[in-house]
Design a protein with these regions (language model features):
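Short beta-strand to alpha-helix junction loop
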Residues: 1-14, 131-140
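Short, conserved active-site loop motifs that form the nucleotide-linked donor/cofactor pocket
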Residues: 19-21, 181
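A conserved short coil-to-beta-strand element within the FAD-binding core of flavoproteins
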Residues: 24-38
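Active-site acidic short loop of glycosyltransferases
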Residues: 49-51, 178-179
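FAD/FMN-dependent oxidoreductases across multiple families
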Residues: 130-226
């Protein structure tokens, strides 16, 4: 797993190499779609014109709201606690996810830091009121709570850096595109982190949209035309809905200590482990591979 600040740093350096301007700290005030372009007016009064506006501004997307695209959504009553921990022993590149009554507890391997310390990223799901209480505790109490779930398999642990919690829910846009407008990433779909697939879905969106736009431009088509953008929507919509439903069912099944459901989930895990093709499907989804993968994610040029 790559730390967010490392990924952001790499993207910024690449953008600078390509001469891409990054405008920060200025919100979009409004946008207007014309026959050949879309005009985006920023809060500082600057207007930008383009053939296509891509909204990738998060699960509470203001641009999606401005475009009038509705969503299907519900709240899980859970929050995800995120932090980085330093531990004595190396993780060996192993990611783990444990299913607890309040929700999944995932340990994701990170590269050692500049001092060579072993590190992992934690995504820890709790009932919302408990998550708020845990995050507000002092460092010692927080680390005790964390150790109860993390265990001592990697030796002593300590929290490295800030910790935060964010509310979890399911949000699926009813449509991904309009003329000269496309949703991507969390603006199109916000899912439960139980399978760690939110970022992978966003990468697939970006790669698929890039492939559709490049191919349309190569053929002399208008990249902002609705029929072009609908190719992107058809490509990505089924995958995102499928993953949203899958994570919703898994969360309801595993984040539960009700006796019959506990038995059912144990049976379900046993079935998956004994059927290679079914197991391969879940592994391919977790790895962000499988059918319908854009060429960029396979390392191919477009």
């Amino acid at each position: 797993m790559v730390a967010n600040k490392v990924l952001n740093g790499s993207l910024r350096r690449r953008a600078a190499e390509l001469g891409i301007d990054i405008i920060e700290g200025v919100a979009v005030d409004r946008f207007e779609v014309g026959a050949a372009t879309v005009a985006v007016r920023l809060a500082d009064g600057v207007t930008l014109d383009a053939r296509l506006l891509v909204a990738a501004d998060g699960v509470r997307s203001r641009l999606r709201e401005m475009a009038g695209i509705k969503t299907v959504e519900w709240d899980y009553g859970q929050s995800g606690i995120v932090c980085t921990v330093v531990h004595e022993r190396p993780h060996g590149g192993r990611a783990e996810e444990h299913f607890l009554p309040a929700g999944p507890f995932a340990t994701l391997p990170l590269k050692p830091d500049e001092q060579g310390r072993n590190r992992s990223s934690i995504v820890w799901t709790e009932r919302r009121e408990d998550a708020e209480r845990i995050v507000a505790e002092d460092d010692l109490v927080f680390e005790v709570e964390l150790e109860q779930r993390f265990g001592l398999k990697l030796g002593e642990i300590s929290v490295d850096g800030p910790r935060r919690a964010w509310p979890l829910g399911l949000t699926l846009a009813r449509g991904f595109v309009k003329p000269r407008f496309a949703l991507a990433g969390d603006a199109a779909h916000g899912i439960h982190p139980i399978a760690g697939q939110g970022l992978n879905l966003g990468f697939k969106d970006a790669a698929a949209l890039a492939e559709v736009v490049v191919e349309a431009d190569r053929l002399g088509q208008d990249i902002g035309a609705l029929d072009v953008l609908e190719d992107y929507e058809r490509w990505r919509r089924f995958d995102t809905v499928q993953m949203g439903v899958t994570t919703d069912v898994l969360n309801r099944l595993f984040s539960n200590d009700f006796g019959p459901l506990r038995t059912l989930r144990d049976i379900g895990l046993g079935i998956v482990d004994r059927l290679p093709r079914l197991k391969d499907f879940f592994i391919s989804q977790a790895a962000g591979t499988g059918e319908g993968i854009p060429r960029l994610l396979k390392g191919e040029a477009i």
